[in-house]
A protein has these predicted regions:
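Extracytoplasmic ligand-binding clamshell segments of periplasmic binding protein
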Residues: 1-36, 47-49, 192
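Extracytoplasmic/secreted envelope proteins and their assembly/folding machinery
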Residues: 12, 16, 27-30, 77-84, ...
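Sec-exported extracytoplasmic/periplasmic mature domains
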Residues: 16, 20, 28, 35, ...
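Short, well-ordered loop/turn elements at secondary-structure boundaries
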Residues: 16-19, 41, 62
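C-terminal lobe and pocket-closing loops
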Residues: 33-39, 55-60, 67-172
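Small-molecule pocket liners
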Residues: 44, 63-66
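Conserved N-terminal structural module of periplasmic/extracytoplasmic solute-binding proteins
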Residues: 75, 91, 95, 163-166, ...
Length: 211
């Protein structure tokens, strides 16, 4: 596979079909290489981003937005929140939420998707214990193959939100650096980073600098 020609979807296709060995993603995307692209569930693992030269190690955090129509009634909004419990996604450990967790885990197991821990959004003990119990009951993978990722993202200070400013442009500049490094063993990393920094600074100046 040519890493310079891949995007979110085709990258997972390459990973799932044997055209690539590594992909940068998170635990919410494990269905892409497996269920969507046919990778054996036992051939997938997750690891944390490597630490930098000073030992600093970070992971990007984000989330999936749930939106309501501006015309939604209070009853409709309340029902939508209730549906989060039905899906097992709410920060509760009641019967409805646990049944949702179990249904999701059963569906994953049936369709060859890793049944693993969730991203540490909710930290109340009742929820975490209930979720861990469901994962243990429906597990279809060797958890050691995923533990290093979860150990990292659960460390205090590991999770960082996107940088303020035009983060997508920053990603584009860093993608140029990554692609150059993995396709040219003699790439001048410092020069590439300096160029990326200069280009990104120009973007910030043009978009945010006040006259």
């Amino acid at each position: 596979a040519d890493p310079t020609a891949e995007d979110w979807g085709t990258g997972f296709q390459q990973l799932g079909t044997g055209g690539a060995a590594m992909y940068i993603a998170a635990n919410d995307a494990v269905a892409q290489p497996t269920q969507t692209n046919g990778l054996d569930v036992k051939k997938l693992a997750l690891g944390a981003m490597p630490a930098g030269p000073n030992g600093d190690q970070y992971s990007l955090t984000g989330g999936t937005p749930y939106m309501f129509s501006k015309d939604a009634t209070p009853e409709q909004i309340s029902a939508a929140f209730d549906f989060l419990e039905v899906m097992g996604k709410a920060p509760e450990a009641n019967d409805t939420t646990i049944k949702g967790m179990e249904a999701d885990a059963a569906n994953r197991k049936q369709n060859g998707v890793p049944v693993i821990q969730t991203f540490p959004c909710w930290t109340n003990k009742e929820y975490v214990d209930a979720n861990n119990k469901v994962v243990e009951e429906y597990s279809n993978v060797d958890t050691a193959m995923f533990q290093q990722f979860f150990d990292a993202v659960n460390k205090e200070g590991n999770l960082h939100t996107e940088e303020p400013g035009d983060a997508q442009e920053m990603y584009a500049q860093l993608t140029n650096v990554l692609q150059a490094v993995i396709t040219n063993k003699d790439a001048d990393i410092q020069k590439l980073m300096d160029t990326a920094n200069s280009n990104y600074q120009k973007t910030l100046d043009s978009e945010f600098k006040k006259n």
